[in-house]
């Protein structure tokens, strides 16, 4: 019987990168046919790239070919975003004719994101995120990402957990919440003391990393109050499951945007603690 893995290996052999072909060639480690066969989960988290920005032109996803796009107040499909004076549909950021892969940064904080969302009306993305937000890449611009998506599984129309910046979404990723769960359960609205609407807590302050030092320094100070609910690594520690974060506090653009730095269990971790060894030192 031809498995999905066999089919994909043959279908992508000519086009896929060598690293992807090598991965597909490795026999699946199927012993029980259950989740117990999974030994390692590797997650790479990027920022500031929307689903359609990468995969809007990929066949088989609800990208620019979506048959049922969100309607705007004007009655037009959601692609026709306004900058306040004109409509700007999606356009190709062609890396063959420009420095499109670098391009320009766009706003990505809570205020501009909420304004673009506009209570679900979604009509002013180009106004509050700038027209650059409407640019997208194609297969020739990001061939490796397209090869991965076609060789393995892609989650259709995958979006951020919270319509705001990087730190809040990384806090959700590492803990399942951006707002103290106990308060949420009581129906109490969040404040900036117990939630993260904008980038704040996931940076050392001042940015006092020490170049060349192999360990986080005891002099690190952090911005904002500590969060004290459990992170995913805390739960894995309790369950006896191994984990590691490959982000070096002393060699990663000032240690910025490490999602666990918002939490007391990481901010106050001491040398030898699991969260210190596996969460703050970078190496294996």
Question: Where in the sequence are the language-model features?
Answer:
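N-terminal pro-sequences and low-complexity stem/linker regions of secreted or lumenal proteins
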Residues: 2, 6-284
